[in-house]
């Protein structure tokens, strides 16, 4: 059951969102990388690669993503589509990043290469299969699993799919200094699902938006439904309020 929020909580969350959803937010955030490249297909590809390593230490994943951007020469979409990544991500068991070895990341990029070669862009792939965020997540998890990639993209939409939810926010929210909104014409922002980052979960409990700290897809959807009381038609504006405050604390 979705809790009814007091007006004071609604006002506080709206104020926090306005404070944190600024251009400054991208500094030290994985969303920064998609703003460093040009062209819709390239921004989309850069964003998808950036989300794939966006966990653990910010210093570490920002550095790893920068190395991938440098290797691509600023053209991530072509770099993947042409298979140039094999030169720096060989299929061996050496560590690539934290829990990922080279073989895992190579298979992830190879599956993405297949998608690009078959469909042109990820947006073109999803717009024929998705009308909301959940169906987009289901299509992506299914495609990567079916094409031999495991351990980076979740195998289904039962987990929180935190990074995919963040990626879909980037792609689907228009009119934002942070998010690009490239897919706003086929994924309505009202359908986006809250990325269940540890900061978001903690602040949600503090504000009484969640009763416990367990993170599942059903929990993420309940939190999103609650945020619709605060931001009608744009629940993930609340992501900036909760995440921004959590990082600041």
Predicted feature residues:
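HhH-family (HhH-GPD) DNA N-glycosylase catalytic core used in base-excision repair
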Residues: 1-249
